[in-house]
Amino acid sequence: MLCARGTYGKAGGLGFEKNWRLNKELAGGGILLDQGIHMLDLMRYLVGDFTQVKSFVENLYWQVPLEDNAFIIMKTADGKVAMVHSSATQWKHKFSLDIFLEDGYLVINGIVTSTRSYGDESITFAKKQFEDETYAFGRPREETIYFDYDDSWKLEIDEFFDCVTGKKDQPQGSVEDALKVMRLVERIYSEAKN
């Protein structure tokens, strides 16, 4: 893996500034804690632990004391870079994760939800193609797979059950992982103040 880029945003909407998600006592933070933390968790899982963090945590539109946008660039000790944008001013629900590899890339878009508000969930992948510079250069052949059903909740419950009953030692998402992503969020907020 070379680098990754993720966007996780929502539309906001009428009365959004009064929503519990923008109430510090109830939510603890703004869009970074609401949605950004999930993208950060994915980035840690895919890219690794980050040793450098640069961030802008901003209130660009909603008149509330919490952030409605977080812009984050992070780097691992071995040089992998990840960029995250978490937004409550996307004006449409959006989930997008681009993963760039030495020999190609993956693009994940959408989330299967009951409302389908994040669009169709898909994964697109392609290999880099330098051999035919007249046609394929900059336009590699892509393949896209669409997903109509979300079984992640069932898989998580099954894994939890296997851990509790001793069939599996440790879940993929541990308490240590949760603590590490919360510490990363603290670093992002702290870096944004500098």
Model-derived features with residue positions:
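Conserved loop-to-helix N-cap of the C-terminal "lid" that shapes the substrate pocket in Rossmann-like
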Residues: 32-36, 150, 172-178
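Predominantly a Rossmann-like dinucleotide-binding segment in NAD(P)-dependent oxidoreductases
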Residues: 1-63
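Hydrophobic alpha-helical segments typical of transmembrane helices
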Residues: 38-42, 95, 156-159
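Generic structural signal for secondary-structure transition and capping sites
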Residues: 1, 48-55, 81, 104, ...
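NAD(P)-dinucleotide binding in Rossmann-like oxidoreductases
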Residues: 62-67, 77-156, 171
